Amino acid sequence: MKKFMMAIVAVLFAAPSFAQYSSGGFSLSESSVYYGLRLGMNMATLTGDDVDAGTKVGLNFAPVIGLRVSDTTPIFLESGLYFTGCGAKKDKASISLNYLEVPILIKYGIQATDDIAVLPFLGPTFRYGLFGGKTKIPGEGKVDSFGDDKFKRADVGIKLGCGAEYNKLYLEAGYQFGITNIANWQLDNDDDASVHNGAFFINVGVNF
């Protein structure tokens, strides 16, 4: 957690230098394609059957690309390849679910000032579980989070939120919720269990 916070601080200190180096301010009327980097955190949890979970902090990191899809209105399509940490934690027990994530977001740009743009967004996100995710059970040690009688690797969700850009610096916050049932086990009555991802997130970054 300490290393993660140091990384966030480093981005915040480095970003003004990048923005000062970059020529000109942001203009929705001039932007057709942009590239960017995102770094931030999830405040993730799990909801559903057999889950009594609190919030777990996870990492977000991604390169992204955005494309303007209309010449007459500031509508953008943004995607990227995220490493994102989800899961849940309560007391000494924890569930870590690490994913590669590809969102497909529709963003609408609102030019607030010459240098500031506000961009609300909404879209689906597609995730696949990576190796390294562990479930920690007190007294039983750690086991893999994905597999039979555990969690499914594939997940589809919805991501929504709002971003703001100032001189190429970018800040966004929002919420993502899973549509897919990621539980890969049955309840005591032989019914399929139902568990879904959910997370508030905040990211900082740059667009160029």
Predicted regions mapped to residue ranges:
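Gram-negative (and chloroplast) outer-membrane scaffold detector with strong preference
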Residues: V33, M41-M43, V64-T135, F200-F208
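Outer-membrane beta-barrel translocator domains and adjoining extracellular loop/strand segments
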Residues: T47-D52, K89-I95, G132-G141, A183-N189
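A generic hydrophobic-segment detector
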Residues: Q20, T47, R127-I179
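Residues that define the transmembrane beta-barrel architecture of outer-membrane proteins
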Residues: S31-V33, A53-L59, S96-V102, I116, ...
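Short glycine/proline- and aromatic-enriched beta-strand/turn motifs that initiate or cap beta-hairpins
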Residues: Q20-V64, N207
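Outer-membrane beta-barrel proteins
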Residues: G25-S27, D49-A53, K92-S94, I110, ...
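Predominantly the C-terminal beta-signal and adjacent terminal strand-loop region
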Residues: F76-E78, Y82, C86-K92, G147, ...
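Cleavable N-terminal export/targeting peptides
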Residues: M1-S29
